[in-house]
Amino acid sequence: MAATDLERISNAEPEPRSLSLGGHVGFDSLPDQLVSKSVTQGFSFNILCVGETGIGKSTLMNTFFNTTFETEEASHHEECVRLRPQTYDLQESNVHLKLTIVDAVGFGDQINKDDSYRPIVDYIDTQFENYLQEELKIRRSLFDYHDTRIHVCLYFITPTGHSLKSLDLVTMKKLDSKVNIIPIIAKADTISKSELHKFKIKIMGELVSNGVQIYQFPTDDEAVAEINAVMNAHLPFAVVGSTEEVKVGNKLVRARQYPWGVVQVENENHCDFVKLREMLIRVNMEDLREQTHSRHYELYRRCKLEEMGFQDSDGDSQPFSLQETYEAKRKEFLSELQRKEEEMRQMFVNKVKETELELKEKERELHEKFEHLKRIHQEEKRKVEEKRRELEEETNAFNCRKAAMEALQSQALHATSQQPLRKDKDKKKVGGWSSIYSVTIP
Protein backbone atom coordinates (compact mmCIF):
# COMPACT_ATOMS: atom_id res chain seq x y z
CA MET A 1 0.00 0.00 0.00
CA ALA A 2 1.38 3.42 -0.92
CA ALA A 3 2.49 5.83 1.77
CA THR A 4 -0.04 8.42 0.67
CA ASP A 5 -2.86 5.89 1.12
CA LEU A 6 -1.62 5.09 4.62
CA GLU A 7 -1.52 8.78 5.48
CA ARG A 8 -5.03 9.23 4.11
CA ILE A 9 -6.33 6.34 6.21
CA SER A 10 -4.56 7.58 9.33
CA ASN A 11 -5.90 11.11 8.85
CA ALA A 12 -9.45 9.96 8.09
CA GLU A 13 -12.02 10.75 10.74
CA PRO A 14 -13.60 7.75 12.46
CA GLU A 15 -17.15 6.79 11.60
CA PRO A 16 -19.68 8.21 14.09
CA ARG A 17 -21.46 5.63 16.20
CA SER A 18 -25.23 5.37 16.23
CA LEU A 19 -26.76 5.43 19.68
CA SER A 20 -30.32 5.02 20.88
CA LEU A 21 -31.87 7.51 23.26
CA GLY A 22 -33.33 6.47 26.55
CA GLY A 23 -36.04 9.11 26.38
CA HIS A 24 -37.28 12.28 24.74
CA VAL A 25 -34.61 14.98 24.42
CA GLY A 26 -36.27 17.68 22.32
CA PHE A 27 -34.11 18.26 19.25
CA ASP A 28 -36.92 16.89 17.10
CA SER A 29 -38.28 20.44 17.29
CA LEU A 30 -35.39 21.79 15.21
CA PRO A 31 -37.47 21.92 11.99
CA ASP A 32 -40.12 23.89 13.84
CA GLN A 33 -37.44 26.24 15.20
CA LEU A 34 -36.04 26.71 11.71
CA VAL A 35 -39.48 27.44 10.30
CA SER A 36 -40.21 29.92 13.08
CA LYS A 37 -36.88 31.68 12.55
CA SER A 38 -37.35 31.81 8.78
CA VAL A 39 -40.86 33.21 9.12
CA THR A 40 -39.60 35.88 11.51
CA GLN A 41 -36.68 36.79 9.27
CA GLY A 42 -38.73 36.77 6.07
CA PHE A 43 -37.67 35.74 2.59
CA SER A 44 -36.30 37.44 -0.48
CA PHE A 45 -36.84 36.45 -4.08
CA ASN A 46 -35.41 38.19 -7.12
CA ILE A 47 -36.78 37.75 -10.65
CA LEU A 48 -35.05 38.93 -13.82
CA CYS A 49 -37.34 39.48 -16.81
CA VAL A 50 -35.60 39.46 -20.18
CA GLY A 51 -37.50 40.03 -23.39
CA GLU A 52 -38.28 42.52 -26.10
CA THR A 53 -40.16 45.70 -25.27
CA GLY A 54 -43.93 45.25 -25.30
CA ILE A 55 -43.85 41.47 -25.01
CA GLY A 56 -45.83 41.49 -21.75
CA LYS A 57 -43.26 41.22 -18.97
CA SER A 58 -44.93 43.70 -16.60
CA THR A 59 -48.40 42.27 -17.26
CA LEU A 60 -47.23 38.75 -16.45
CA MET A 61 -45.64 39.90 -13.18
CA ASN A 62 -48.87 41.62 -12.18
CA THR A 63 -50.77 38.44 -13.02
CA PHE A 64 -48.31 36.25 -11.11
CA PHE A 65 -48.68 38.02 -7.79
CA ASN A 66 -52.29 39.14 -8.28
CA THR A 67 -51.43 42.80 -7.75
CA THR A 68 -50.42 45.87 -9.72
CA PHE A 69 -46.78 46.88 -9.64
CA GLU A 70 -46.17 50.51 -10.49
CA THR A 71 -43.79 50.46 -13.44
CA GLU A 72 -42.86 53.03 -16.04
CA GLU A 73 -43.69 52.22 -19.63
CA ALA A 74 -40.58 51.65 -21.71
CA SER A 75 -40.15 53.06 -25.20
CA HIS A 76 -38.74 51.32 -28.25
CA HIS A 77 -36.03 53.95 -28.66
CA GLU A 78 -33.58 53.05 -25.89
CA GLU A 79 -29.97 53.63 -26.92
CA CYS A 80 -28.78 50.65 -24.88
CA VAL A 81 -30.06 47.95 -22.57
CA ARG A 82 -30.45 49.06 -18.96
CA LEU A 83 -31.53 47.08 -15.92
CA ARG A 84 -34.33 48.56 -13.83
CA PRO A 85 -34.77 46.87 -10.43
CA GLN A 86 -37.80 47.53 -8.24
CA THR A 87 -38.30 46.03 -4.78
CA TYR A 88 -41.65 45.39 -3.10
CA ASP A 89 -42.68 44.05 0.31
CA LEU A 90 -45.41 41.44 0.02
CA GLN A 91 -47.22 39.47 2.70
CA GLU A 92 -49.33 36.33 2.41
CA SER A 93 -50.76 35.02 5.68
CA ASN A 94 -47.87 35.53 8.13
CA VAL A 95 -45.08 35.12 5.55
CA HIS A 96 -43.19 38.23 4.43
CA LEU A 97 -41.55 38.28 1.01
CA LYS A 98 -39.19 40.96 -0.24
CA LEU A 99 -39.67 40.69 -3.98
CA THR A 100 -37.33 42.35 -6.47
CA ILE A 101 -38.31 42.46 -10.13
CA VAL A 102 -35.53 43.45 -12.52
CA ASP A 103 -36.62 44.47 -16.00
CA ALA A 104 -34.17 44.51 -18.91
CA VAL A 105 -35.42 47.73 -20.50
CA GLY A 106 -34.65 48.21 -24.19
CA PHE A 107 -33.56 44.61 -24.81
CA GLY A 108 -33.66 43.84 -28.53
CA ASP A 109 -34.58 47.38 -29.58
CA GLN A 110 -31.16 48.41 -30.92
CA ILE A 111 -30.06 48.02 -34.52
CA ASN A 112 -26.75 46.53 -33.39
CA LYS A 113 -27.66 43.74 -30.95
CA ASP A 114 -24.20 42.20 -30.60
CA ASP A 115 -23.67 43.35 -27.01
CA SER A 116 -27.27 43.40 -25.81
CA TYR A 117 -26.52 40.63 -23.31
CA ARG A 118 -23.54 42.39 -21.73
CA PRO A 119 -25.44 44.80 -19.39
CA ILE A 120 -27.46 41.83 -18.11
CA VAL A 121 -24.34 39.75 -17.42
CA ASP A 122 -22.65 42.72 -15.75
CA TYR A 123 -25.67 43.30 -13.51
CA ILE A 124 -25.76 39.67 -12.36
CA ASP A 125 -22.00 39.70 -11.68
CA THR A 126 -22.34 42.95 -9.75
CA GLN A 127 -24.90 41.38 -7.40
CA PHE A 128 -22.61 38.39 -6.87
CA GLU A 129 -19.70 40.74 -6.19
CA ASN A 130 -21.71 42.74 -3.65
CA TYR A 131 -22.61 39.56 -1.76
CA LEU A 132 -19.00 38.34 -1.89
CA GLN A 133 -17.72 41.64 -0.50
CA GLU A 134 -20.25 41.37 2.32
CA GLU A 135 -19.05 37.83 3.08
CA LEU A 136 -15.40 38.90 3.15
CA LYS A 137 -15.98 41.71 5.64
CA ILE A 138 -14.51 41.31 9.11
CA ARG A 139 -17.74 42.54 10.63
CA ARG A 140 -20.41 41.15 8.37
CA SER A 141 -24.13 41.02 8.92
CA LEU A 142 -25.60 38.63 6.36
CA PHE A 143 -28.69 38.32 8.54
CA ASP A 144 -29.69 41.92 7.75
CA TYR A 145 -28.13 42.01 4.29
CA HIS A 146 -30.57 42.49 1.42
CA ASP A 147 -29.66 39.71 -0.96
CA THR A 148 -30.04 41.04 -4.51
CA ARG A 149 -28.65 38.00 -6.34
CA ILE A 150 -30.92 36.94 -9.20
CA HIS A 151 -32.72 33.69 -8.35
CA VAL A 152 -34.48 33.11 -11.66
CA CYS A 153 -34.46 34.59 -15.15
CA LEU A 154 -37.75 34.44 -17.00
CA TYR A 155 -36.72 34.61 -20.64
CA PHE A 156 -39.64 35.80 -22.78
CA ILE A 157 -39.58 34.31 -26.28
CA THR A 158 -41.43 36.06 -29.09
CA PRO A 159 -44.16 33.75 -30.48
CA THR A 160 -42.91 33.61 -34.06
CA GLY A 161 -43.84 29.94 -34.45
CA HIS A 162 -40.64 29.20 -36.39
CA SER A 163 -37.43 29.17 -34.33
CA LEU A 164 -35.42 31.07 -31.77
CA LYS A 165 -33.72 34.28 -32.79
CA SER A 166 -29.93 34.43 -32.76
CA LEU A 167 -30.15 37.09 -30.05
CA ASP A 168 -32.11 34.68 -27.83
CA LEU A 169 -29.61 31.85 -28.26
CA VAL A 170 -26.57 34.05 -27.64
CA THR A 171 -28.10 35.71 -24.58
CA MET A 172 -29.25 32.47 -22.95
CA LYS A 173 -25.86 30.88 -23.63
CA LYS A 174 -24.14 33.78 -21.86
CA LEU A 175 -26.54 33.57 -18.90
CA ASP A 176 -26.91 29.83 -18.30
CA SER A 177 -23.83 29.60 -16.05
CA LYS A 178 -24.88 32.63 -13.99
CA VAL A 179 -28.61 32.28 -13.37
CA ASN A 180 -31.49 29.80 -13.45
CA ILE A 181 -33.17 30.28 -16.82
CA ILE A 182 -36.81 29.38 -17.42
CA PRO A 183 -37.81 30.04 -21.05
CA ILE A 184 -41.42 31.02 -21.61
CA ILE A 185 -43.35 31.74 -24.78
CA ALA A 186 -45.08 35.07 -24.30
CA LYS A 187 -48.47 35.96 -25.77
CA ALA A 188 -49.11 32.32 -26.58
CA ASP A 189 -52.66 33.13 -27.67
CA THR A 190 -51.35 34.62 -30.92
CA ILE A 191 -50.53 31.22 -32.48
CA SER A 192 -52.56 28.04 -32.83
CA LYS A 193 -52.16 24.98 -30.59
CA SER A 194 -50.55 22.90 -33.34
CA GLU A 195 -48.07 25.67 -34.15
CA LEU A 196 -47.40 26.12 -30.44
CA HIS A 197 -46.63 22.42 -29.98
CA LYS A 198 -44.20 22.41 -32.93
CA PHE A 199 -42.67 25.66 -31.68
CA LYS A 200 -41.97 24.14 -28.24
CA ILE A 201 -40.26 21.12 -29.80
CA LYS A 202 -38.22 23.41 -32.08
CA ILE A 203 -37.12 25.60 -29.16
CA MET A 204 -36.00 22.69 -26.98
CA GLY A 205 -34.13 21.14 -29.91
CA GLU A 206 -32.26 24.38 -30.60
CA LEU A 207 -31.40 24.84 -26.93
CA VAL A 208 -29.97 21.32 -26.71
CA SER A 209 -28.05 21.58 -30.00
CA ASN A 210 -26.50 24.89 -28.93
CA GLY A 211 -25.58 23.66 -25.45
CA VAL A 212 -27.83 26.05 -23.54
CA GLN A 213 -28.47 24.80 -20.00
CA ILE A 214 -31.90 25.87 -18.76
CA TYR A 215 -33.26 25.27 -15.28
CA GLN A 216 -34.71 21.80 -14.77
CA PHE A 217 -37.15 21.31 -11.93
CA PRO A 218 -35.48 18.96 -9.41
CA THR A 219 -36.57 15.33 -9.31
CA ASP A 220 -34.36 14.15 -6.42
CA ASP A 221 -36.96 15.09 -3.80
CA GLU A 222 -39.61 12.39 -3.57
CA ALA A 223 -42.24 14.89 -2.46
CA VAL A 224 -42.09 16.83 -5.73
CA ALA A 225 -40.24 14.44 -8.05
CA GLU A 226 -43.32 13.26 -9.93
CA ILE A 227 -44.88 16.66 -10.59
CA ASN A 228 -41.51 18.20 -11.50
CA ALA A 229 -40.77 15.41 -13.96
CA VAL A 230 -44.12 16.03 -15.63
CA MET A 231 -43.59 19.81 -15.71
CA ASN A 232 -40.09 19.44 -17.21
CA ALA A 233 -41.78 17.91 -20.23
CA HIS A 234 -43.91 21.05 -20.66
CA LEU A 235 -40.93 23.42 -21.03
CA PRO A 236 -40.96 26.06 -22.39
CA PHE A 237 -44.21 27.24 -20.83
CA ALA A 238 -46.64 29.04 -23.11
CA VAL A 239 -48.25 31.81 -21.06
CA VAL A 240 -50.83 34.55 -21.37
CA GLY A 241 -50.98 37.46 -18.96
CA SER A 242 -53.91 39.70 -18.11
CA THR A 243 -55.14 41.74 -15.17
CA GLU A 244 -58.60 42.29 -16.62
CA GLU A 245 -61.54 40.31 -15.31
CA VAL A 246 -64.07 38.90 -17.74
CA LYS A 247 -67.36 37.28 -16.80
CA VAL A 248 -67.46 33.67 -17.93
CA GLY A 249 -70.67 31.99 -16.91
CA ASN A 250 -71.40 33.13 -13.40
CA LYS A 251 -67.77 33.84 -12.44
CA LEU A 252 -65.32 36.66 -13.02
CA VAL A 253 -62.01 35.30 -14.25
CA ARG A 254 -58.79 36.92 -15.44
CA ALA A 255 -58.82 36.63 -19.18
CA ARG A 256 -58.24 38.33 -22.50
CA GLN A 257 -61.36 39.23 -24.46
CA TYR A 258 -61.25 38.80 -28.25
CA PRO A 259 -63.99 39.07 -30.89
CA TRP A 260 -63.77 35.34 -31.44
CA GLY A 261 -63.80 34.37 -27.76
CA VAL A 262 -62.11 34.53 -24.37
CA VAL A 263 -58.65 33.26 -23.36
CA GLN A 264 -58.68 32.47 -19.65
CA VAL A 265 -55.34 33.02 -17.96
CA GLU A 266 -55.84 30.37 -15.28
CA ASN A 267 -57.41 27.77 -17.54
CA GLU A 268 -54.79 25.08 -18.20
CA ASN A 269 -56.52 24.17 -21.44
CA HIS A 270 -55.81 27.68 -22.73
CA CYS A 271 -52.22 28.30 -21.57
CA ASP A 272 -49.50 27.17 -19.13
CA PHE A 273 -49.76 30.11 -16.75
CA VAL A 274 -50.95 28.00 -13.80
CA LYS A 275 -48.19 25.43 -14.40
CA LEU A 276 -45.53 28.16 -14.43
CA ARG A 277 -46.88 29.83 -11.30
CA GLU A 278 -47.07 26.54 -9.43
CA MET A 279 -43.55 25.50 -10.43
CA LEU A 280 -42.00 28.89 -9.86
CA ILE A 281 -43.65 29.95 -6.61
CA ARG A 282 -45.43 27.15 -4.80
CA VAL A 283 -43.13 24.17 -5.49
CA ASN A 284 -39.61 25.28 -6.43
CA MET A 285 -39.01 28.79 -5.11
CA GLU A 286 -36.67 27.56 -2.36
CA ASP A 287 -34.80 25.32 -4.80
CA LEU A 288 -34.23 28.31 -7.08
CA ARG A 289 -32.80 30.22 -4.13
CA GLU A 290 -30.62 27.27 -3.16
CA GLN A 291 -29.38 26.69 -6.73
CA THR A 292 -28.45 30.36 -6.98
CA HIS A 293 -26.36 30.17 -3.82
CA SER A 294 -24.82 26.70 -4.11
CA ARG A 295 -24.23 26.60 -7.86
CA HIS A 296 -24.08 29.96 -9.60
CA TYR A 297 -22.76 32.06 -6.74
CA GLU A 298 -20.25 29.38 -5.70
CA LEU A 299 -18.93 29.26 -9.27
CA TYR A 300 -18.49 33.03 -9.28
CA ARG A 301 -16.93 32.98 -5.79
CA ARG A 302 -14.49 30.21 -6.71
CA CYS A 303 -13.36 31.99 -9.88
CA LYS A 304 -12.85 35.28 -8.02
CA LEU A 305 -10.87 33.64 -5.19
CA GLU A 306 -8.73 31.75 -7.69
CA GLU A 307 -8.03 35.03 -9.47
CA MET A 308 -6.91 36.41 -6.10
CA GLY A 309 -4.53 33.44 -5.68
CA PHE A 310 -6.47 31.36 -3.15
CA GLN A 311 -6.61 27.59 -3.55
CA ASP A 312 -7.66 24.60 -1.47
CA SER A 313 -4.62 22.40 -2.17
CA ASP A 314 -1.25 22.42 -3.89
CA GLY A 315 -0.12 20.28 -6.80
CA ASP A 316 0.30 17.21 -4.54
CA SER A 317 -3.29 17.51 -3.28
CA GLN A 318 -2.12 18.70 0.12
CA PRO A 319 -4.78 20.89 1.71
CA PHE A 320 -4.01 24.54 2.33
CA SER A 321 -5.31 26.44 5.28
CA LEU A 322 -6.45 30.01 4.85
CA GLN A 323 -3.46 31.19 6.89
CA GLU A 324 -1.03 29.30 4.65
CA THR A 325 -2.71 30.66 1.56
CA TYR A 326 -2.59 34.16 3.01
CA GLU A 327 1.10 33.86 3.92
CA ALA A 328 1.98 32.44 0.51
CA LYS A 329 0.04 35.20 -1.21
CA ARG A 330 1.63 37.79 1.07
CA LYS A 331 5.13 36.56 0.24
CA GLU A 332 4.26 36.51 -3.43
CA PHE A 333 2.89 40.03 -3.15
CA LEU A 334 5.96 41.28 -1.28
CA SER A 335 8.32 39.69 -3.79
CA GLU A 336 6.28 41.18 -6.60
CA LEU A 337 6.34 44.53 -4.82
CA GLN A 338 10.13 44.34 -4.43
CA ARG A 339 10.49 43.40 -8.07
CA LYS A 340 8.30 46.33 -9.08
CA GLU A 341 10.27 48.65 -6.79
CA GLU A 342 13.54 47.43 -8.30
CA GLU A 343 12.14 47.92 -11.78
CA MET A 344 10.98 51.41 -10.83
CA ARG A 345 14.36 52.21 -9.28
CA GLN A 346 16.19 50.92 -12.34
CA MET A 347 13.84 52.84 -14.59
CA PHE A 348 14.48 55.95 -12.50
CA VAL A 349 18.26 55.46 -12.69
CA ASN A 350 18.09 54.91 -16.43
CA LYS A 351 15.87 57.93 -16.79
CA VAL A 352 18.31 60.04 -14.77
CA LYS A 353 21.20 58.83 -16.91
CA GLU A 354 19.30 59.55 -20.07
CA THR A 355 18.42 62.99 -18.74
CA GLU A 356 22.05 63.65 -17.80
CA LEU A 357 23.19 62.62 -21.26
CA GLU A 358 20.54 64.82 -22.80
CA LEU A 359 21.59 67.74 -20.59
CA LYS A 360 25.26 67.21 -21.43
CA GLU A 361 24.42 67.06 -25.11
CA LYS A 362 22.37 70.23 -24.76
CA GLU A 363 25.24 71.86 -22.85
CA ARG A 364 27.71 70.85 -25.55
CA GLU A 365 25.42 72.19 -28.25
CA LEU A 366 24.94 75.44 -26.32
CA HIS A 367 28.72 75.74 -25.79
CA GLU A 368 29.37 75.19 -29.49
CA LYS A 369 26.72 77.70 -30.34
CA PHE A 370 28.21 80.15 -27.86
CA GLU A 371 31.71 79.70 -29.33
CA HIS A 372 30.32 80.11 -32.81
CA LEU A 373 28.53 83.30 -31.83
CA LYS A 374 31.62 84.46 -29.99
CA ARG A 375 33.75 83.99 -33.11
CA ILE A 376 31.17 85.79 -35.18
CA HIS A 377 31.14 88.60 -32.63
CA GLN A 378 34.91 88.86 -32.61
CA GLU A 379 35.01 88.86 -36.40
CA GLU A 380 32.39 91.57 -36.49
CA LYS A 381 34.30 93.49 -33.84
CA ARG A 382 37.51 93.20 -35.84
CA LYS A 383 35.77 94.42 -38.95
CA VAL A 384 34.27 97.32 -37.01
CA GLU A 385 37.72 98.22 -35.61
CA GLU A 386 39.20 98.16 -39.10
CA LYS A 387 36.40 100.31 -40.38
CA ARG A 388 36.91 102.66 -37.44
CA ARG A 389 40.66 102.95 -38.14
CA GLU A 390 40.01 103.50 -41.82
CA LEU A 391 37.47 106.12 -40.91
CA GLU A 392 39.92 107.81 -38.53
CA GLU A 393 42.64 107.77 -41.19
CA GLU A 394 40.26 109.18 -43.75
CA THR A 395 39.13 111.76 -41.19
CA ASN A 396 42.75 112.75 -40.43
CA ALA A 397 43.60 112.93 -44.13
CA PHE A 398 40.53 114.97 -44.73
CA ASN A 399 41.41 117.29 -41.85
CA CYS A 400 44.93 117.69 -43.25
CA ARG A 401 43.64 118.46 -46.69
CA LYS A 402 41.13 120.80 -45.14
CA ALA A 403 43.81 122.63 -43.18
CA ALA A 404 45.98 122.89 -46.29
CA MET A 405 43.09 124.21 -48.28
CA GLU A 406 42.24 126.67 -45.58
CA ALA A 407 45.87 127.84 -45.53
CA LEU A 408 45.92 128.21 -49.30
CA GLN A 409 42.62 130.03 -49.23
CA SER A 410 43.97 132.32 -46.51
CA GLN A 411 47.09 133.06 -48.50
CA ALA A 412 45.09 133.63 -51.66
CA LEU A 413 42.72 135.88 -49.80
CA HIS A 414 45.59 137.77 -48.29
CA ALA A 415 47.25 138.15 -51.67
CA THR A 416 44.04 139.29 -53.24
CA SER A 417 43.46 141.92 -50.55
CA GLN A 418 47.04 143.32 -50.96
CA GLN A 419 46.86 143.77 -54.76
CA PRO A 420 44.03 146.40 -54.82
CA LEU A 421 45.83 148.40 -52.17
CA ARG A 422 48.98 148.56 -54.30
CA LYS A 423 46.95 149.64 -57.31
CA ASP A 424 45.43 152.44 -55.28
CA LYS A 425 48.85 153.58 -54.24
CA ASP A 426 50.06 153.52 -57.82
CA LYS A 427 47.04 155.53 -58.90
CA LYS A 428 47.73 158.08 -56.21
CA LYS A 429 51.29 158.38 -57.34
CA VAL A 430 50.30 158.92 -60.97
CA GLY A 431 47.71 161.50 -59.98
CA GLY A 432 50.30 163.49 -57.99
CA TRP A 433 52.70 163.70 -60.88
CA SER A 434 49.94 164.86 -63.18
CA SER A 435 49.04 167.74 -60.88
CA ILE A 436 52.60 168.66 -60.68
CA TYR A 437 52.85 168.56 -64.38
CA SER A 438 49.66 170.57 -64.72
CA VAL A 439 50.97 173.25 -62.42
CA THR A 440 54.32 173.62 -64.00
CA ILE A 441 53.27 173.71 -67.58
CA PRO A 442 51.82 177.00 -68.65
Swiss-Prot record:
Which residues constitute the signal peptide according to the record? none
Where in the body, by tissue, does this protein show up?
Expressed in cerebrum, hippocampus and cerebellum (at protein level). Expressed in heart (at protein level).
Stretches the record annotates as G1 motif? 51-58
Instruction: Please state which protein family the record places this protein in.
Output: Belongs to the TRAFAC class TrmE-Era-EngA-EngB-Septin-like GTPase superfamily. Septin GTPase family.
Residue numbers of N-acetylalanine PTMs: A2
User: What are this entry's molecular-function GO terms?
Assistant: GTP binding; GTPase activity; molecular adaptor activity; SNARE binding
The residues listed in the UniProt record as binding GTP, with positions renumbered to this chain, are 51-58, 106, 187-195, 241, 256
Residues covered by region (G3 motif): 103-106
Q: Which residues form a coiled coil?
A: 322-407
Annotated stretches, region: Disordered: 1-21, 411-442
Biased composition of type Basic and acidic residues is found at: 1-16
Compositional bias annotation for Polar residues? 411-420
Enumerate the InterPro entries for this protein: G_SEPTIN_dom (IPR030379), P-loop_NTPase (IPR027417), Septin (IPR016491)
Q: What broad class describes the main subcellular location of this protein? A: cytoplasm
This one is known as Septin-8
Q: Which residues form the Septin-type G domain?
A: 41-307
- Top-level division of the source organism's lineage: Eukaryota
Q: Provide the alphabetized UniProt keywords.
A: Acetylation, Cell projection, Coiled coil, Cytoplasm, Cytoplasmic vesicle, Cytoskeleton, GTP-binding, Membrane, Nucleotide-binding, Phosphoprotein, Synapse
Q: Where in the cell is it found?
A: Cytoplasm; Cytoplasm, Cytoskeleton; Synapse; Cell projection, Axon
